Amino acid sequence: MKIQNKKTYLAVLILVTIDQVIKIVINNNFFDKISPILPPLLYFKPMFNRQYSWLNSMLQLGVGKYTHILLVAIMSILIYLFYKYLNKQFGTNKIINIMYAFIFSGAMCSLIDKIFWNGSLDYILVNDFFTFDLKDVYINIFSGLLILSLFLKNKVLNQIDDNIVKDFTKYILRKL
């Protein structure tokens, strides 16, 4: 494993640890507390989201825990395999490693939340509309970096063409 990839996996471990330690501290010491952060927009207001995903919660879809665990596990595997594929096809790239660290950390935190917390301990309330946690920030950082990279035409991302889905599918099938 290349040094850059080792740093990426260390970053994943650190990001997941930070997310989970924050949740443990909040659950044990601050769960019943409400504090303004930037009133009237942001508040610290911990709550458990037992709907397992934002989409399931907002649309009241009723999709259960084990279905969510399976979906997140499959997505995590696909994210991992796609990262390995990009490294094999294009070599290591700093922005790809950073993006992977955030999206894979978000996926791992989501999986941990569903398995061990029976949902997500969210704690930042936005405008009395929705509540989020650090894992959601990780996923949004990934999304922002992806958009920025596409906008700035990152050289590795520019090499990715219309055949990537077909090539990635072949890569996965060879792994099986």
Could you tell me what each predicted segment is?
Residues 1-176:
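Alpha-helical transmembrane bundles and membrane-interface segments of multipass inner-membrane proteins
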